[in-house]
């Protein structure tokens, strides 16, 4: 039978150079190559884009207007292509309502399970509550031993204050003779005088019966009479001290608390029928925090301790806020020059929360010298800022205030997102929120062993089977430490991608082309086998799985490897080698093959640095950290390792980075929970080199971020042409009026709105996409205008500015981190996370350092080929050579083996992690029998 292929001919998207390639269908194919070589251009911008476009074209024009139309990629022909699904890292849902449970759809099945077989309990007292029909009540009472005496009461008042005169009169007129009030029997004919301010319980005696055959009709009539009197509640007194309370609705027969009819929507925090009415299902509230408003309590009020807009000028004697603080100090007898931390607790409370109903006398002279005396109630800093926030309509001003807010759990639901009634329903003795907070491995065990009655099992069988299958897929991709309640916005790119991968396997689609972008990111070597097995399973279902990947194990297990290169940018865009791992290893032109065969390798450092000073963290308890004490060496290169979810990010990002940024950089951050930190005096600043974009708009680019554009504009402004025309540096900015093209406001492109098609961006007709007006472009330096320079690659700019050391140094560092191929004016929106991170790294390397900086990097090898990793390690070593402290969270063993010191966390993820397993040099950790990292590291050190 003829093998089916996806045939690509003449692919020219981005830097691809007329690529012709045949990819076998229903296979696991890895696309690899240097960063910027064209892998993503081939996988996402060509194969996926064309597969998606063809599917879209099959839809009606009406449907297309809602879905959007994808542009046809620059390719001559693609044959044998299936509908394509892209699972990348950029499409993580940041909606606060989105959780792991909702993304995987497990929560939808859980809602159905709880609605169908959940046992409701009273939200107040916790008693199990059941609703029963009149017939069920009769049958229950008739099962009592013959001769059993009983009294039927209607509880008409339960624990309410008042004299209840009208109610008692109404009951008497209805023909009832006796009632039990607060436990005592009364004849309704007698005068009953109840204490108005006490709580009372009134139960009307409806009937007295003895259990025997033939009383069913009378019992039924009496029960119906009771239920009509008491809104569905029946109290049976058996005259021996035993009482039975029954209800026709989900209401507690003891205290009367009721819950609504149980439906799947009762457990949805995105539906008003289930959502907590206080936080509307978000689970938290944003509240102003005094710690963020007064970040440095060692300052006095006169020194500007308050950093809130409108209060920052409180040290200015002409401001009204200063006049109020003076009035406060006079009334309560404290000095505005005393450090805030030394003020008495009572005074600090008044400053933050106000004087209550007490007035103060404020003497205020306006800028025109007119003096006024006011009697005002001081509302307090927190109340003042909250009021101004609520009254303000400007989005920019709101964002300004929001930096002083922190997230706190909702006071009503405590983060559970649901109404009390919904949270009182249990399955297997757990509420839906309790089951969702279990780590997925524990959740899977719980749902697999939950005890149900025979009837409940019949109802829930299909639901539980679906939940078990989907949670098992999550375990198969190494996400055992996550919980279903985890907010989707807090997931890393790799975690989000593996969740979507598990969801796709759960969907059971066949005949699809899956395009994945480095699914192994953030995954420990221990869990890599599970991920590879998952990819193979997706393939075995009958799908084509095309993975952009740099992981060695994935390459060795792939059916086919396509090596794109040979270099990056203009030097890439070609297929260097195609074949199995063994075939690639024999190819002399393939850098990937040379690394796989061991001909090329990232060398171990000749000598590991030693240290004398440490940054000491005590009592770290953020997330799953278990009261951790750890010493982080200073002036060396340290890697924090451990399985996914072991607590690395909680320690490094939430505690070390945020506390150091707050103290050293005066940043408005609230660190995670820890007891104390020592050793900060050896550092002067902390810099987090993450993978967030270098800018949010196309106006931001590598030239503006690195600061080289300022130097280039200075150079153009000092040219002969510019001086003759009187042009200054500002003339060469595309962000301000003067030199830019005003037709496109310096964007170079113009947006044209289309109705049934996506918006089209076309080059500006006035400047032809060059961003500047004609006069500005006439100014040249060495024959090139400002647009030509922005269009240069880093490599070209290095040659062009050979005699300008300040510019050349910045270009050199960009080349050192493997970014020789990017253009100086390339919009930040076109850069990958890995490229953005390396631009930040290069910017730091080009600065003249103090040698006292703490650099923090979280998985910097994302998107990097073996050769790029080698360059990255060299850069990190250079930072440490300058006396700086480099702290890296990493799973890549080539980086780990080059570190001076390792902090290995674990042993497992989630609740099974959160401790420091071992510390030491890579050699010491490799010999530790309890370290998973050490086990895999061993072969890299030999």
Where are the regions that the model predicts?
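Conserved phosphate-binding elements of NTP-dependent enzyme cores
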Residues: 1-942
């Amino acid at each position: 039978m003829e093998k089916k292929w996806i045939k690509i001919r003449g692919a020219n998207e981005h830097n691809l150079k007329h690529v012709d390639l045949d990819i076998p269908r229903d296979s696991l194919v890895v696309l690899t190559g240097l960063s910027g070589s064209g892998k993503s251009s081939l996988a996402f911008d060509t194969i996926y884009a064309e597969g998606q476009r063809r599917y879209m074209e099959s839809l009606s024009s009406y449907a297309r207007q809602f879905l959007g139309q994808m542009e046809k990629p620059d390719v001559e022909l693609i044959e044998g292509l299936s509908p394509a699904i892209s699972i990348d890292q950029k499409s993580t849902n940041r909606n606060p309502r989105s959780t792991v449970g909702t993304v995987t759809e497990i929560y939808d099945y859980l809602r159905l399970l709880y609605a169908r077989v959940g046992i409701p309990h009273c939200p107040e007292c916790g008693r199990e509550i059941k609703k029963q029909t009149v017939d069920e009540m009769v049958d229950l009472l008739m099962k009592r031993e013959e001769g059993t005496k009983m009294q039927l009461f209607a509880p008409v008042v339960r624990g309410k204050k008042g004299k209840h005169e009208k109610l008692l009169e109404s009951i008497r007129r209805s023909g009832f003779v006796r009632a039990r009030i607060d436990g005592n029997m009364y004849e309704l004919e007698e005068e009953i005088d109840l204490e108005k301010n006490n709580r009372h319980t009134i139960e009307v005696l409806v009937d007295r019966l003895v259990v025997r055959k033939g009383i069913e009709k009378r019992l039924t009539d009496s029960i119906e009479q009771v239920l009509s009197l008491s809104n569905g509640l029946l109290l049976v007194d058996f005259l021996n001290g035993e009482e039975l309370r029954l209800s026709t609705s989900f209401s507690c027969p003891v205290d009367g608390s009721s819950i609504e009819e149980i439906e799947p929507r009762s457990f949805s925090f995105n539906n008003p029928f289930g959502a907590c009415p206080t936080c509307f299902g978000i689970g938290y509230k944003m509240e102003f925090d005094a710690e963020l408003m007064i970040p440095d309590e060692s300052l006095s009020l006169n020194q500007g301790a308050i950093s809130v807009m409108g209060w920052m000028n409180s040290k200015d004697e002409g401001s009204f806020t200063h006049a109020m603080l003076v009035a406060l100090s006079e009334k309560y007898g404290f000095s505005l020059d005393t450090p805030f931390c030394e003020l008495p607790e009572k005074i600090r409370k008044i400053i933050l929360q106000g004087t209550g109903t007490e007035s103060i006398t404020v003497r205020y002279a306006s800028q025109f010298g007119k003096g006024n005396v006011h009697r005002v109630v001081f509302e307090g800093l927190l109340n003042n800022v909250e009021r101004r926030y609520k009254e303000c309509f400007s989005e920019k001003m709101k964002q300004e205030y929001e930096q002083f807010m922190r997230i706190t759990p909702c006071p009503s639901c405590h983060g559970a997102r649901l109404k009390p009634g919904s949270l009182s329903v249990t399955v297997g003795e757990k509420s839906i929120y309790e089951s969702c907070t279990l780590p997925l491995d524990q959740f899977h065990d719980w749902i697999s062993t939950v005890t149900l009655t025979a009837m409940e099992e019949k109802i829930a069988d299909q639901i539980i089977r679906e939940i078990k299958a989907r949670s098992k897929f999550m375990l198969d991709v190494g996400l055992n430490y996550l919980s279903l309640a985890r907010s989707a916005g807090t997931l890393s790119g790799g975690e989000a991608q593996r969740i979507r991968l598990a969801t796709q396997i759960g969907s059971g689609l066949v005949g699809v082309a899956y395009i994945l972008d480095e699914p192994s990111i953030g995954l420990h070597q221990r869990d890599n086998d599970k991920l590879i097995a998952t990819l193979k399973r997706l393939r075995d279902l009958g799908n084509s799985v095309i993975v952009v990947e740099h992981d060695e194990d994935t390459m060795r297990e792939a059916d086919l490897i396509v090596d794109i290169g040979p270099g990056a940018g203009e030097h890439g865009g070609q297929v260097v080698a195609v074949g199995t791992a063994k075939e690639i290893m024999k190819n002399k032109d393939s850098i990937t093959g040379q690394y796989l065969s061991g001909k090329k390798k990232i060398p171990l450092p000749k000598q590991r640095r030693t240290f004398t000073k440490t940054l000491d963290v005590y009592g770290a308890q953020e997330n799953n950290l278990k009261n951790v004490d750890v010493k982080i060496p200073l002036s060396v290169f340290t890697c924090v390792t451990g399985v996914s979810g072991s607590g690395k990010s909680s320690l490094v990002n939430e505690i070390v980075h945020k506390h150091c940024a707050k103290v050293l950089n005066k940043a408005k951050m609230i660190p995670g929970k820890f007891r104390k930190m020592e050793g900060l005096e050896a550092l002067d600043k902390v810099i987090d080199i993450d993978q967030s974009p270098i800018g949010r708009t196309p106006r931001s680019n590598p030239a503006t971020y690195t600061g080289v554009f300022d130097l280039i504009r200075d150079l153009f402004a000092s040219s002969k042409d510019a001086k003759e025309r009187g042009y200054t540096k500002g003339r060469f900015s595309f962000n301000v009026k003067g030199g830019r093209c005003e037709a496109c406001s310096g964007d170079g492109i113009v947006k044209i709105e289309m109705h049934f098609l996506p918006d089209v961006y076309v080059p500006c007709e006035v400047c032809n996409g060059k961003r500047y007006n004609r006069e500005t472009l006439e100014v040249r330096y060495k024959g090139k205008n400002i647009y030509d320079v922005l269009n240069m690659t880093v490599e070209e700019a290095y040659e062009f500015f050979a005699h300008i050391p300040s510019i050349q140094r910045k270009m050199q560092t960009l080349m050192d981190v493997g970014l020789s191929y990017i253009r100086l004016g390339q919009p930040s929106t076109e850069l990958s996370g890995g490229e953005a991170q390396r631009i930040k790294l290069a910017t730091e390397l080009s600065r003249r350092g103090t040698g006292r900086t703490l650099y923090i990097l979280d998985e910097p090898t994302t998107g990097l080929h073996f050769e790029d990793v080698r360059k990255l390690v060299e850069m990190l070593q250079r930072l440490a050579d300058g006396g700086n402290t480099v702290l890296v969270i990493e799973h890549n063993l080539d980086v780990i083996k080059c570190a001076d010191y390792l902090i290995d966390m674990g042993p497992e993820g989630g609740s099974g992690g959160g401790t420091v397993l071992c510390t030491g040099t890579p050699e010491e950790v490799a010999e530790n029998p309890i370290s998973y990292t050490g086990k895999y590291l061993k072969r890299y050190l030999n």
